[in-house]
């Protein structure tokens, strides 16, 4: 974040600030300091240079986003984490269905964990009258890998785009150099997560999925919301989302594995030993995942899952507060064993 300020000043995108309080508030704003969103000086710093008053509507919206973030973290991510740890630790003794569930649970563990933190951070910032950039845009409803990366960890991917990809020449330096630049971005994205070959391979895996779309000029095809203005997607969209989701799940196996051998062994066992036998216990996360997907599907054109327009049935304050209390109590009752936020380690 401090680096973005230096670069933006150097590139004359923003003037150097002489307000030391505003500058230190920018680089140390606590809601998003640990795990994002990674803010730009052009967006966040000017908000500390002007007077801000308390906004009731903004605070209410912030509390809604905090509540939804807590649900994603405490109910979805933490309950998935217990099953994920068990399955990945004992994967060599389990059947393919168990292994697929382990991969599925980790897919939603990392989403609930990371996007939940982002929701909490963005909501907390709103209580202070500060607007942070959106970090997740319902990525598991993507129709191809390019769309997934426009919706996943938006603050980091756009940071890499603006400060690495474009300075390298972007896509205006010829197709081969543009492909090279794209590959570099994905490898840097993997290396950013840690000095483990699994992260590098995860980045390379996504690069291999992205580059064919880039070569065919289809990497910016799906920029709208899936099934926009419709209740359900069509068959083509369902197939696109399903295939994209499976590819993302495979990528998360590589990301979660301790080493490359384990990742390959896990995937091979999952495919060759698939037995269609559901485990007798540990299926509760499926219910929480289903709730998450249903809510976010119907809210996919909004900023976050609990963003409510005060009209229709929600124009009544009693209805809104009942919803808040039900979700809050449900989160407390169904919360899994407390787990540290995954992205605290990166």
Language-model features: locations:
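Membrane-embedded transmembrane alpha-helical bundles that form the catalytic cores
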Residues: 2-345
């Amino acid at each position: 974040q401090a680096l973005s300020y230096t670069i933006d000043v150097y590139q004359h995108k923003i003037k150097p600030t002489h307000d030391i309080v505003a500058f230190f508030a920018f680089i140390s704003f606590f809601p998003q300091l640990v795990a994002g969103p990674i803010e730009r000086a052009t967006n966040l710093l000017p908000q500390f240079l002007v007077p801000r008053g308390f906004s009731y509507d903004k605070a209410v919206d912030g509390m809604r986003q905090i509540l939804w973030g807590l649900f994603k973290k405490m109910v979805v991510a933490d309950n998935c984490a217990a099953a994920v740890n068990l399955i990945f630790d004992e994967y060599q003794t389990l059947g393919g269905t168990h292994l697929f569930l382990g991969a599925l649970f980790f897919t939603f563990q990392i989403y609930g964990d990371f996007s939940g933190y982002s929701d909490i951070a963005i909501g907390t910032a709103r209580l202070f009258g500060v607007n942070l950039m959106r970090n997740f845009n319902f990525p598991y409803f993507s129709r191809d890998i390019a769309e997934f990366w426009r919706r996943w960890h938006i603050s980091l991917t756009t940071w890499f785009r603006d400060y690495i990809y474009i300075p390298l020449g972007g896509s205006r330096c010829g197709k081969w150099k543009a492909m090279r630049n794209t590959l570099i971005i994905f490898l840097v994205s993997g290396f950013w997560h840690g000095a483990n070959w699994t992260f590098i391979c995860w980045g390379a895996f996504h690069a291999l999925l992205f580059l064919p779309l880039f070569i065919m000029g289809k990497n910016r095809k799906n920029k709208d919301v899936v099934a926009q203005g419709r209740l359900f997607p069509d068959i083509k969209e369902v197939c696109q989302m399903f295939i994209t989701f499976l590819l993302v799940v495979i990528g998360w196996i590589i990301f979660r594995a301790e080493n490359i051998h384990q990742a390959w062994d896990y995937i091979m066992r999952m495919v060759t030993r698939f037995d269609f036998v559901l485990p007798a216990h540990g299926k509760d996360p499926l219910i929480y995942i289903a709730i998450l997907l249903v809510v976010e599907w119907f809210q996919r054109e909004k900023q976050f899952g609990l963003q409510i327009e005060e009209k229709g049935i929600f124009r009544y304050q009693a209805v809104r507060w009942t919803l808040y209390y039900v979700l809050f109590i449900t989160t407390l009752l169904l919360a899994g064993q407390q787990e540290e936020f995954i992205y605290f380690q990166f």
